[in-house]
Amino acid sequence: MLNRMKSARPKSVAPKSGQALLTLGALGVVFGDIGTSPLYSLHTAFSMQHNKVEVTPENVYGIISMVLWTITLIVTVKYVMLVTRADNQGQGGILALVALLKNRGHWGKFVAVAGMLGAALFYGDVVITPAISVLSATEGLTVISPSFERFILPISLAVLIAIFAIQPLGTEKVGKAFGPIMLLWFVTLAGLGIPQIIVHPEILQSLSPHWALGLIVAEPFQAFVLLGAVVLTVTGAEALYADMGHFGARPIRVAWFCVVMPALILTYLGQGALVINQPEAVRNPMFYLAPEGLRIPLVILATIATVIASQAVISGAYSLTKQAVNLKLLPRMVIRHTSRKEEGQIYMPLVNGLLFVSVMVVVLVFRSSESLASAYGLAVTGTLVLVSVLYLIYVHTTWWKTALFIVFIGIPEVLLFASNTTKIHDGGWLPLLTAAVLIVVMRTWEWGSDRVNQERAELELPMDKFLEKLDQPHNIGLRKVAEVAVFPHGTSDTVPLSLVRCVKDLKLLYREIVIVRIVQEHVPHVPPAERAEMEVLHHAPIRVVRVDLHLGYFDEQNLPENLHAIDPTWDNATYFLSALTLRSRLPGKIAGWRDRLYLSMERNQASRTESFKLQPSKTITVGTELHL
């Protein structure tokens, strides 16, 4: 089995036209978050500590230098050049990295906890990104006229409501426009920055890291606090890794080096030059870069870009949740496909609803991008540090390469994280609270599922005893049905409770019994031809077949489709599901909060009928009461 699972990925390379389309697609999905960071990053830096950072050439050179070298070290070196090589059959993201490391001996438990924490922090990022992005875009209206300020909140809420309202429709059609629109956005960023650089070429001094180091030496505390704003320039860096499975590493690298990185460097240099020449522009340097006649079109384009950035992180939340469900970190949820062509385009009603409520509350509580900026950094930097630790465990390289990574990437990331801890009281509590809630949910689900499996194992009949009873004379009293029955089951050495009840209580015995166990592999996809392992446990008169179905964490758990590939005669089978009614052994008021939380999640998770893509008319649910 292991040899079969290690089949190499195809070495074929897409033709140049295909690579170009993938690169354009990556611009629309992967780089939306980091591409909209110039809307608020520099403004946030100068508004730190109630505008204590003076707008002087030295401070501007130092801040811009810190921004450019943070982008270079974390995004270019770490993600684009290094981490994207740590793929799991082409898939990326922190849970893909965790799946690669699951069996690393004594690291296993730490890796699982780190992956859970990283996923939880990502959800904090997902809640904040749509809110801060859309708010920062609509705040450009105040540059046109201060009287527009009262419209910022209603417009932002309307845009966000529209984003979440269209989720059930999917993005297959409008998604094709994301790439060209984001290409226009990055060209606009570069085009707005270049004139200011030409007029004030001295800003090019910021390319030298000595300005960043000089600011750190001259004003260490101020520089430390500024790191909390500098990190905003690399929000979305994790998307380069997480979305690798959709586009491939090469198109992402091409898009970064040819379009995104040059555009970001030019716009940050341009904003720095503008602020030196016009200190009042620090209120919103992105929109002050544009001539007055182009500011309304820029606000419109920026709003569209932030909608695309929001869509990217929402889609990322769906994908991450699906991985978490398949890895048994979360209960089953309803998953709906919104595209017949793209398997990865999905919609999850529960996730969408929770995100919608969370984002609305965040916007109404914080009310401005400046206030939200304080909340943003902790989720981002926490994920950065965790990915670095997991990456070092994965590569297990020579000591001097590890030392270089720690010095040039690890230490700066830890400093970025430490700087953001100073903002906990100003909003940094938000991602921490979100992460804490999700960790409690995931740990409770794991804990409760383990207890259920232990209790269930005590009720289930050992497989060998069941097979012995099939040959015993007293089975003549059973009503035999000349059809096929399929029993999904979690283990291979016991009999499903639904089958036990079927024989014991219903007195039914089917001509052919198929017991299906889904084996979750730590890879994104298992090729259809390599999924099934079948063993005939009992022949005539009752045929018992055990099927182990090996699926990746991105594969659909579609039982009829997968079983058809094994034996088309099973198409008309009747499916029997075990439905557990869970009760706590303790009275309601005494039962612990963990018991109550788990029981609530178990009762409200999506039905297995829908998760396994079964027809209700061909599915029978057999109930069993279980006391925990």
Curated annotation (Swiss-Prot):
InterPro entries associated with the record: K+_transporter (IPR003855), K_trans_C (IPR053952), K_trans_N (IPR053951), Kup (IPR023051)
UniProt keywords, alphabetically: Cell membrane, Ion transport, Membrane, Potassium, Potassium transport, Symport, Transmembrane, Transmembrane helix, Transport
GO annotations of cellular component type: plasma membrane
Disulfide bond entries: none
Organism domain of life: Bacteria
Membrane topology type: Multi-pass membrane protein
Membrane-spanning segments: 20-40, 63-83, 110-130, 151-171, 178-198, 212-232, 256-276, 296-316, 346-366, 375-395, 398-418, 422-442
GO MF annotation terms: potassium ion transmembrane transporter activity; symporter activity
Reactions catalysed, as given in the entry: K(+)(in) + H(+)(in) = K(+)(out) + H(+)(out)
Compartments in which it is found: Cell membrane
Main subcellular location of this protein, as a coarse class: membrane
Annotated function: Transport of potassium into the cell. Likely operates as a K(+):H(+) symporter.
HAMAP family: Kup (MF_01522)
Similarity remark: Belongs to the HAK/KUP transporter (TC 2.A.72) family.
Protein's recorded name: Probable potassium transport system protein Kup
